[in-house]
């Protein structure tokens, strides 16, 4: 009887061990933006495809809207392993690595074609920098072109002076300084409240963000289509979590990441067109700036690109040379 009991205990332990081994890895994916945002929807589809195709080896569960970690917390959470995977707005991480700010240099890349060339030129150095911080880069997707929102009409450089301006990274703070606007740091989740309370009167962001926030309901009547830059969100994985996957699963994740990146760029292009129309349909004035303002913004962009190149050093110079054939 004792022998039978010992055999049963041993078998139970073996079955339990097999079940644990077959359970696979589970990754909770931190997303800063709401479930309806195209970045979050794209990430959710990526997670679903990996989960379904991995044969139980990897399950990815998405947590949109900052429900797992807020936007400003995600990079650190993934780096420290509190979250195995997450998505973060790249240019908010300039203090981590200046290369992550390259896509937010005003008027450096003003079309999707140029944005893709800049991405290809900068990606190797960005991947290398993230690897040194214990992170694995999966994919990056741009927001639609950044335009200037304002509560009041802007017809001259003088109209910018003292305008309360939403800043969210070092680039937008510097733009405010160079144009005479007054910067206030506001995260994406706080945009509507900031405009409704008068904390800010203007911002640079995509037509998609304005549409999703129904920004016209907060007294914002103008969108100037200046196509300042195409900032990206990137998806990163904690390297220790990554190394727990077998080679086949790692290959699957990278394959699905490439598909998500392609789809994300297509969704961004579609949103760039459709969301500007949505702003106009809601009663906002959607327009280009006049030639004097355009020239002023381009001068600001040239100044900032030079400053960024100095800050980024030889790595930044090599990226700009690969992108445009010349350094700053």
Regions found by a protein language model. Give the residues of each.
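Bacterial N-terminal signal peptides that target proteins for export
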Residues: 1-8
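Sec/Tat signal peptide C-region and signal peptidase I cleavage site
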Residues: 16-23
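N-terminal secretory/targeting leader peptides
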Residues: 9, 23-116, 122-328
